[in-house]
C-alpha cells in the first residue's frame, strides 16, 4: 500500500538540502526551538511579503538568517527602517547576534508554498475555490512548470459535509526521486472552518546533489 510522504523531506540529500544549516553537540533542542520561533516570527511579521522559505545558518558568534521573499520591499521598508526593527526584536527574542539577508524570489508563481498561501488568501476573501485553484494552476504552467497538483479539503463553499477537491494539470511523478517537486501547505481560516490547501509543483528532472 502506497504511503504519503512530504516530497521535500523524501528528497533531502538527493536534490534538496536542509533549511537549518548547523551542527550542535549540546543544546540541540534549544537551537531547534530557536529556529522554530524565528521562522514563526518572520512569517507572522511579514505575512503579506510572500516568504517562500527561511534558511538559518549558525556560526560561532552570529546567526545568519536568509529570508527568501517575492516582495523584498515589504520587508525592508523605507530606507531599511522595517528591517532594523525586526533585527532588534529578534536579538531580544533569542539573545544572539543576527545577520539578516533578504533574497528576492524571481518566479513566485513556481513556489508551491506561495501558491498555497495565495489560494488560502483568496478563499478567506470568499473567492470560489474552483476559480482560485484553476487560476493558480494556469499561472504556474504559463511560467514554465511541467505539472501541478492542488487539493483543497474542508467545508468547501460552506457545504455541511467536508470533502476534498483536486485539480491537476501536466505530470507530477511523486515516485521519481530525481524529479524536482516543490510542495507547499497552507490553511484558510473561513467562517465555516479551516480549509487545508496542498500544492505539488513539478519543475522537471534534476541531477542528484551527490553526482
From Swiss-Prot:
Top-level taxon: Bacteria
PANTHER family per the UniProt record, alphabetical: 30S/40S RIBOSOMAL PROTEIN S3, SMALL RIBOSOMAL SUBUNIT PROTEIN US3C
InterPro entries attached to this UniProt entry: KH_dom, KH_dom-like_a/b, KH_dom_type_2, KH_sf_prok-type, Ribosomal_S3_C_sf, Ribosomal_uS3_bac-typ, Ribosomal_uS3_C, Ribosomal_uS3_CS
Keywords noted in UniProt: Ribonucleoprotein, Ribosomal protein, RNA-binding, rRNA-binding
Residues of the KH type-2 domain: 38-106
SUPFAM superfamilies (UniProt xref): Prokaryotic type KH domain (KH-domain type II), Ribosomal protein S3 C-terminal domain
Function recorded in the entry: Binds the lower part of the 30S subunit head. Binds mRNA in the 70S ribosome, positioning it for translation.
HAMAP family reported in the protein's UniProt record: Ribosomal_uS3_B (MF_01309_B)
Subunit structure: Part of the 30S ribosomal subunit. Forms a tight complex with proteins S10 and S14.
Example of a GO MF term: mRNA binding
Protein family (similarity comment): Belongs to the universal ribosomal protein uS3 family.
Gene: rpsC
Identification of the protein by name: Small ribosomal subunit protein uS3
CDD domains listed in its UniProt record: KH-II_30S_S3 (cd02412)
Gene Ontology BP terms: translation
Gene Ontology CC entries for this record: cytosolic small ribosomal subunit
Amino acid at each position: 500500500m502506497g504511503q504519503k510522504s512530504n516530497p521535500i523531506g523524501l528528497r533531502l540529500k538527493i536534490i534538496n538540502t536542509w533549511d537549518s544549516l548547523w551542527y550542535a553537540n549540546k543544546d540541540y533542542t534549544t537551537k531547534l526551538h530557536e529556529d522554530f520561533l524565528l521562522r514563526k516570527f518572520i512569517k507572522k511579521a511579514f505575512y503579506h511579503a510572500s516568504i517562500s522559505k527561511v534558511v538559518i545558518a549558525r556560526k560561532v558568534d552570529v546567526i545568519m538568517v536568509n529570508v527568501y521573499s517575492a516582495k523584498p520591499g515589504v520587508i525592508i521598508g523605507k530606507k531599511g527602517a522595517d528591517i532594523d526593527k525586526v533585527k532588534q526584536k529578534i536579538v531580544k527574542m533569542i539573545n544572539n547576534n543576527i545577520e539578516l539577508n533578504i533574497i528576492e524570489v524571481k518566479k513566485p508563481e513556481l513556489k508551491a508554498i506561495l501558491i498555497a498561501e495565495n489560494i488560502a488568501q483568496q478563499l478567506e476573501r470568499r473567492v470560489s475555490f474552483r476559480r482560485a485553484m484553476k487560476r493558480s494552476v494556469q499561472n504556474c504552467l504559463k511560467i514554465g512548470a511541467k505539472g501541478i497538483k492542488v487539493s483543497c479539503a474542508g467545508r468547501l463553499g460552506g457545504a455541511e459535509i467536508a470533502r476534498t477537491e483536486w485539480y491537476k494539470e501536466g505530470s507530477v511523478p511523486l515516485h521519481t526521486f530525481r524529479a524536482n517537486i516543490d510542495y507547499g501547505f497552507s490553511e484558510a481560516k473561513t467562517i465555516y472552518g479551516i480549509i487545508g490547501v496542498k500544492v505539488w509543483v513539478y519543475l522537471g528532472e534534476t541531477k542528484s546533489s551527490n553526482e
